[in-house]
Amino acid sequence: MVSAAYFAEVADRPEYDKYKYEQLDCQGFVEKVLYDSGVRKPDGSRYNRRGSNSMWRSALSWRGTIAEAVQKFGTLPAGAWAFIVTDDGGEKDRGYTDGEGNASHVGIYVGGGMVRDSTRSTKTKRDGVGSRSINDFNMIGLCKYLDYDVQNVNNKSQIKSILDDIENKLRELREVLL
């Protein structure tokens, strides 16, 4: 099984920056990095999901909020998938009415508070593959095809300290933005 750390290293390669969103959307980017890092179906072919909602529902061994990931693993694991999920009942035109939310976007957490993704969002002022803050995402998932080798290495007080640091940084960012 491919290590999630290696998967994150592959995702962070500058060679992906040449792709525009129309060439490689968010799902396509994650799937290309899976393939480029050596992850294959048992028959040797590449994984091909029906979008970020399909990834959210069926490609993960664990999922939760960013705070839950930090509490469980002591940190955000490199190679984790970062999602933007809204609680609007699902993407109904694709048959997702299970109440698990609408995963409208997916990227790859590469460490250092950064996510690699493909977007055409004006908020990021780019069209295609690039990097942005984990703070633009609200949910985390661990892909069942990757080896995260994660364990909670922090005790309760260390976890509280990490969460307090994150809250303080978010507060500082809000003050700057407002």
Predicted features by range, described:
Residues 8-11, 30-34, 174:
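Non-transmembrane alpha-helical segments in soluble domains
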Residues 11, 19, 108-110:
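Alpha-helix C-terminal capping segments
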Residues 1-17, 122-156:
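Non-catalytic ligand/cofactor/substrate-binding and regulatory segments of enzyme domains
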Residues 21-25, 71-74, 99, 158:
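Extracytoplasmic/periplasmic, Sec-exported soluble proteins
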Residues 155-178:
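Short, low-complexity, charged amphipathic interaction modules
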